[in-house]
Amino acid sequence: RRYDLDILRILLTVLVVLGHASYYTINTKFGGIHYDQILSDMMIQDAGVHKATSLLTEWIYSFHMPAYFCLSGAVFSLELKKNRYSSVSKLIREKAKRLLIPLLFVWFVWNIPIKMLAGYYDGLAHPLMMAVIQIIFPNAVYLWFLEALFFCFIMDYVIEKHIKNVGQQFIIVGTLALIGLGFYKYARQIVPFGNPFRWLIWFWTGHFIDDILNELSKTSENHGFKSKKRAFVAESFLFALLYEISFCTASVKWILINTVMPFVGIIWIWTFARIIESALKEEHHKKLLAISQNTYGVYLWAEPLNYLVLSCVMKWFGISVFGTEMGAALIYIVRVVGTVVISVLITNMLRKIRCPIKAY
């Protein structure tokens, strides 16, 4: 078993939870929340804690979703080598069962009801209808990932089966990435199914990530970096430098965050996962696997609870608590710890009752 992939899955899930725990504002055509605007209207200054966690989220978002797609592509590459999918129809059936059915289940029994309670759809003439339509246009809804991932599996399968030349494959996924980035920049609110064109290139990169890392490891050794840890430090400096450069201008930032930054971030966090794996003893593998098996459930069930936490704090304590350092810190901690605990409980309950819908 590839324990480095389990570790990577855990690390990325942690980053997702941390990233989701900082937002005060979500704007979509289908609803949203506007706590930043309320703070501004009440002339309450944002807390330093929230500013810091927002910066952390911005850094996380510079690479963690491309890394997620790359991880999925790496696992898919291993499956293809074992001839797991004999046809595209079999692939569609299996991935629909694993991705789309859980998506719809969670969307209707969890995402919509919780957001209704939290006021996400307030002000809409037809909130339920808009909530259903939003499935097709899931911009700023965390479940967009499953939609985009489903189509990435299909597109990648077709490319891998019918085009053997890697250069030609790169031209195709690169062209689709440019189209997807155009959609993202100019029409993100109306791009359907999570904009899979934008993410396919990172999924496809998963086929080659081991070779890339192994080659970089050899190059690092030739330049005096005799251990993964030293290479990791060098990668960290490069990552930090690129992130600093990205603040030069908005255009430079946009280009870097959609091209170089994700690639460097993928290399960085993958190396980190390998360092952790090399430090683990064999008796830790069972615990590692148990944690890894909960990551999908955390992804599915945790995020909507953020809306409920914010809504409850607003109703019980008022907007002023958002502007205090202690209040902002406690809100963030509850959003991180509370959402994970509840989602793990739900995941284990569904696993225990053997729920036929694999939303865990």
Q: Which stretches of residues belong to each language-model region?
A:
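Alpha-helical transmembrane segments and their immediate juxtamembrane cytosolic regions
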Residues: R1-Y360
